[in-house]
Amino acid sequence: GSGGLIVMDEDTCMVDMARYFLNFTRDESCGKCTPCRVGTKRLLEKLEKITSGNGTLEDIDDLEALCHYIKENSLCGLGQTAPNPVLSTLKFFRDEYVAHVVDKKCPAGVCKSLLHYEIVADKCKG
């Protein structure tokens, strides 16, 4: 087993952080059991959809249900713990997920697809 502690601040996007960890666990899955092999891929697809600005509130609900399914039906510790970053961020930072899908904004300003720039013509000199 292993464990770790990561310190983050308001400049960390919790949705992107969950996506990062799911990317790792998807790559590390041995592929023996379907819940882990396919489930982590589906979770990652949903997270990528949300961080790209194409997610829906239904995707958030689907994430949570799929996390519980993977956790309860995977054969090994990797599959059983793979959903933890998603479940933790949904529990404590659900508002960030909602901001991504409803407001189409990343509160931390991390998700590039959700960044919008505007030129203020009267302040622009050039």
State the predicted function of each range.
Residues 1-116, 125:
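Redox cofactor-anchoring modules in respiratory/redox and cofactor-processing assemblies
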